[in-house]
Design a protein with these regions (language model features):
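Pyridoxal 5′-phosphate
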Residues: 3-205
Length: 205
């Protein structure tokens, strides 16, 4: 199944050449553990849970009605917010990317420069590890990530970057910044200043 950042980009399941698509509610503000799987037509799928035959025999067990309602409400609200703020988020992302490149010219943006999530900026910083940069930025009041959420705390090299062809020595210097609301110019300046000072300090050691 193709995992999608629902509520951040328009979902066009009918137009996409995929058999299945999954969404995780915590990505758009619902309680953790809620999600949905969209399966195209007659795509064969094996159930993980068996028993009572609920949900067309694909997921047996008592249905979480409250969770399903929360997922639907969260997705509706997130989609409405996305439509209202999409352009602002893209502008904030691009301003942040430009600011980071300005203060740390050696930083390389990972992924496609245009076809990316509106509130997402990921870089590699030669000469430092993402973990060291993350810790230093945290001390300066800046929250970021050095890998995917499912690998946090394990100090692993981001598998996505390795799959994109980056060398392990480069991939381990990754830092990811995400946001769900448009950033003010002052916020971007604060992040870029902290990053400039942090990177300079770490590369001098």
């Amino acid at each position: 199944a193709l995992p999608i950042s629902a509520g951040q980009i328009p979902i066009r399941f009918r137009d996409w050449d995929v058999d299945a698509l999954s969404v995780s509610g915590h990505k758009f503000g619902t309680p953790k553990g809620l999600g949905a799987l969209l399966v195209r037509g007659r795509t064969p799928i094996e159930p993980v849970l068996s028993g009572g035959g609920q949900e067309r025999g694909l997921r047996s067990g008592t249905q979480n009605v409250a969770g399903a309602v929360a997922l639907a409400i969260g997705l509706n609200e997130s989609n409405a917010r996305m439509q209202a703020q999409y352009r602002e988020l893209v502008a904030s992302r691009d301003m942040l990317i430009d600011a980071v490149r300005r203060v740390v010219p050696r930083a390389d943006l990972t992924g496609d420069p245009v076809r990316r999530l509106p509130g997402h900026a990921s870089f590699v910083f030669p000469g430092v590890t993402g973990e060291a940069l993350l810790v230093d930025l945290d001390a300066r009041g800046i929250a970021a990530s050095s890998g995917s959420a499912c690998a946090i705390g394990r100090h692993e090299i981001p598998a996505t970057l390795l799959a994109m062809g980056l060398e392990p020595s480069v991939a381990k210097s990754a830092l990811r910044m995400t946001f769900r609301r448009p950033l003010a110019r002052e916020q971007i300046e604060r992040v870029s200043l902290a990053l400039e000072e942090s990177y300079a300090g770490l590369t001098r050691r």
